[in-house]
Amino acid sequence: MMEGRMMNKNYDFSYTQDRELSWLKFNERVLREADKKNVPIFERLKFLEIFTNNLDEFFMVRVGSIHEMSLIHDNHRDIRSDLTPEEQLDEIAKHVRPLYELRDKIFAKVSKELADKKIKRCQIEELEKEEKKKLKTYYEAMILPVLSPIVIGKQHPFPHIPNKILQIGLILKKKEKISFGIIGLPKDVERMILSLIHI
């Protein structure tokens, strides 16, 4: 029945919507909650986290499937939007880029409000000497033992990188030789560390 409807030249696709683009609009509404002044500030951070995690899953599952379909080159069209997989990917990219930009702006806004309440993210250069010392001890005890640096080369081709694992890329120089390395940060390593000196 649906195939017959697709073949009908009079079918108006403006009454239906691509599932992926519809989902992105839903996730945008989640993001907009983080920009509401009447929402408690830590709840706004939570909405930012939910929005970002949702997009991670979206790219892993839905975009991955559409990309695989695009490699088949059979001109299959979506039954709701009449878009090919390539066209869907283009539309997704057009919608996602502004969302990430908006996410970053909202995060900067929330971070400033937190800083006004004496809650702020600090770079290593901003720490006091005693804080740096305690942080170094924490790093050597809790982080360094679980790191596994990899230098990419002929003997070590680029490895499979698991989803949702933070990877740090490094350009390594030794005399005239330049190489590339990566360090994966395991999920159980804390991304944020409270200033131990003030606890």
Over which residues does each language-model region extend?
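Extended, charge-enriched "interface" segments that sit outside catalytic cores
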Residues: 35-38, 48-124
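Conserved small/polar residues in nucleotide/adenosyl-binding loops
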Residues: 30, 47, 197-199
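Duplex nucleic acid-engaging cores and interfaces of nucleic-acid transaction enzymes
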Residues: 99-116, 120-196
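N-terminal amphipathic/basic-hydrophobic helices that include classical n-h-c signal peptides
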Residues: 1-2, 199
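N-terminal amphipathic, basic-rich helices that act as targeting or association modules
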Residues: 17-25, 31-39, 43-46
